[in-house]
């Protein structure tokens, strides 16, 4: 048997009824709002706008998602829409208020056009790039030229001279120079930390240079008496050393050092004498060998003859 299914009708969406007068009112309201944007109003409070620019108390509501209807229903419900009632007071505002808004908008636009954007260095955090302690770059920098390194890095972060404070219509006249003060503070702090390091290093090197004691200069009489004492005995210790130092007007340590140096000099002299004697002996032996060779050659010549 042939079965016939009943014809089911689907709901058809119809466009919302919109009048041309409501569209005109909406366009006029949008044009009025674009002519006087809220961004150019000095204050964001709506209390200042209520005397001259009152807004509508009712907000239009449009139901874009109607409730579903049964599939076999042929009656399409109409969506009620409240017409938008324009507020004529927006277009008939007080002339003084409109003039004030226009002046504020013109001042804001002219300031943005004449003033350049703030440099990135005034908003960024200043970071001094100092090489690490163990790196080879740090070895090339001593404490004395740390100031030069800091000034080179800060010169790259400072704005050019054309954007320095004092120029008309510049960003730095309206915004306090917080970035410049921060950079100056960082420079002062870095220099305050680098100067003591340089002073400490200089003092340390000066102490190392002064650590070596001055050489004692002995007088002629002192040297002669010490030489006479050294010829008699090469080692002077104990009470004898103290008595000798007291007699010569020296300290026991000075006497001890003089004898040490004199013994070293004596040993070097002995070594030089030994070397010289060995060289003389070798030269004498070589001379004797040559004479013997000459005599043997003469004897050989006589035998041949």
Swiss-Prot record:
Q: Where does this polypeptide localize?
A: Nucleus
Instruction: Give the protein's function.
Output: Probable transcription factor. Required for differentiation of AIY interneurons, acting downstream of LIM/homeobox protein ttx-3. Modulates gene expression, acting downstream of AMP kinase aak-2/AMPK signaling. Modulates lifespan.
Q: Where is the composition biased (Polar residues)?
A: 120-135
Q: Which residues bind DNA?
A: 211-270
Q: Which gene encodes it?
A: ceh-23
- Which GO molecular function annotation, any one, does this entry have? DNA-binding transcription factor activity, RNA polymerase II-specific
Organism of origin: Caenorhabditis elegans
State the protein's name: Homeobox protein ceh-23
Q: Where is this region: Disordered?
A: 113-140, 262-305
Knockout-associated phenotype: Viable and display no obvious neuroanatomical, morphological or locomotory abnormalities. Lifespan reduced in an isp-1 or nuo-6 mutant background and extends lifespan in the short-lived gas-1 and mev-1 mutants. Expression of the G protein-coupled receptor sra-11 is normal in AIY neurons at the larval L1 stage, but drastically reduced in adults. RNAi-mediated knockdown reduces lifespan in various mitochondrial mutant backgrounds, including isp-1;ctb-1, or clk-1.
């Amino acid at each position: 048997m042939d079965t016939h299914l009943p014809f089911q009708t689907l709901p058809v969406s119809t466009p919302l009824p919109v009048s041309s007068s409501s569209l005109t009112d909406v366009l006029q309201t949008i044009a009025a709002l674009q002519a006087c944007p809220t961004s150019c109003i000095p204050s964001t409070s709506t209390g200042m706008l209520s005397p001259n620019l009152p807004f509508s108390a009712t907000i239009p509501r449009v139901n874009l998602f109607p409730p579903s209807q049964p599939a076999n229903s042929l009656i399409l419900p109409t969506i009620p829409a409240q017409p938008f009632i324009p507020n004529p007071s927006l277009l008939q505002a007080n002339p003084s208020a409109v003039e004030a808004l226009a002046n504020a908008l013109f001042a804001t636009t002219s300031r943005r056009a004449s003033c350049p954007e703030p440099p990135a260095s005034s908003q960024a955090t200043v970071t001094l790039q100092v090489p690490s302690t163990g790196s080879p770059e740090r070895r090339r920098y001593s404490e004395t030229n740390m100031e030069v390194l800091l000034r080179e890095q800060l010169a790259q972060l400072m704005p050019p001279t054309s954007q320095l404070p004092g120029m008309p219509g510049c960003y730095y006249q309206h915004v306090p120079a917080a970035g410049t003060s921060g950079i100056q503070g960082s420079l002062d702090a870095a220099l305050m930390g680098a100067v003591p390091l340089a002073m400490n290093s200089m003092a340390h090197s000066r102490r190392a240079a002064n650590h070596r004691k001055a050489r004692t200069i002995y007088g002629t009489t002192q040297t002669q008496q010490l030489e006479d004492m050294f010829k008699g005995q090469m080692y002077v210790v104990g009470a004898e050393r103290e008595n000798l130092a007291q007699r010569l007007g020296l300290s026991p340590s000075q006497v001890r050092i003089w004898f040490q140096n004199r013994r070293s000099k004596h040993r070097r002299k002995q070594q030089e004498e030994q070397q010289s004697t060995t060289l003389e002996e070798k030269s004498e032996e070589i001379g004797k060998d040559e004479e013997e060779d000459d005599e043997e050659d003469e004897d050989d010549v006589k035998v041949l003859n």
